[in-house]
Amino acid sequence: MSNAPDPRPRPPAVKTLDHTVAAVPLLQGRVLLHEHAQHTPRPRPALDDSLSGVVMTGANADARAFQLRADVGYQGTLLIDSAVYTTYTATAEEPFMAPPDELFAAVDTSLNFQKARGATAALTPTGYIPPANSRALKGVMREANRIERADTLVSLPIDVTWLSRENIGQLIAVCDKIRHPKAVILFRQFDPLGQTKDIPANLRRLFTEVEYMSLLRTDLAALDVMAHGALCAGIGVQSSLRHAIPPDEKAQVGKRGGGPTYPHILMPQLMCFKGAEFLSKVYGNSDPATCDCEECDGRSLDRFYLSDGETRREAENHNIHTWGAWVSDMASYRAGSERKTWWRNKCAAAVDRYALENQRIGVGASPKSGFQVPAPLKAWATLPATQ
């Protein structure tokens, strides 16, 4: 038997944080990137490690997170979201996905396992909380308050109707009684914040009235809550990771008939995500919008109408550079009214550009021929900055 050393390089040991290391200071002020666990992790140079991080999301998230740490060598902020809420619905008796006779022990094991796989903080395995199901919501509160750890975020995967006029008061009251930091995930087909006019304002109210709230698996709503006092937030790398849908529903898509899928592109001047296919068509007879981010370097934004992996990665890098620059800008303003005013003015300026862009390319503001202002953006531009 040979005693010669093994010539194969060993992956570096993954550093783990004890459960007594508090989550709040490690996550404060960060806008994280939701990566999909179906893909092999890779470096993301576009991410600013001082203001961002990664949420590995999906059924294989723990293994992919470990790969990201051990194989890729990622040392930044990392959360593991196994997304149990996509298959499991919370009940009053079993709000977390675990055997009922082992609920507390199983939850603690889940949290420990996340930390062992390299997570900076741990997310509870909370099931989807259906509309107006007060007993399930209170069940989450009851079991969450049994957790004796400093490193835990209580995941709140709620139907967006919890932010309605009828339900927001109860949601705020229950969240206020959960003694750990909270991480909200909104459920609805397409954009949850576009459902009713009350939703953007009531989401702000939740984040203003309850301390240490986070909004994960979202879009530019991440920046709105950050401007209004959120602990942290997370933006999806692809459209399916910018919201969630209930376990008993299939994802609805705007495109019929199947076929290849194309990336969604963050428009820097208009502050919205638009599909590459739409951009290719809307700019078919005019000069396309361009971008000066590090990835684009002045190139046009209609170039992503391809379904290959390289084009998708380029589109993702553009998106990260774009919203990452806004996060950096926001951090330069003092938290409170100064930051809120900056954000409101930025959104208002973007709203004003829609008519100018439609006029420039000679189209009307219809879904088929031109750009329409998204309802949430319009709300962010008009709601009082003090709210």
What would you call each of these model-derived segments?
Residues 183-229:
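Loop-centered beta-sheet repeat module
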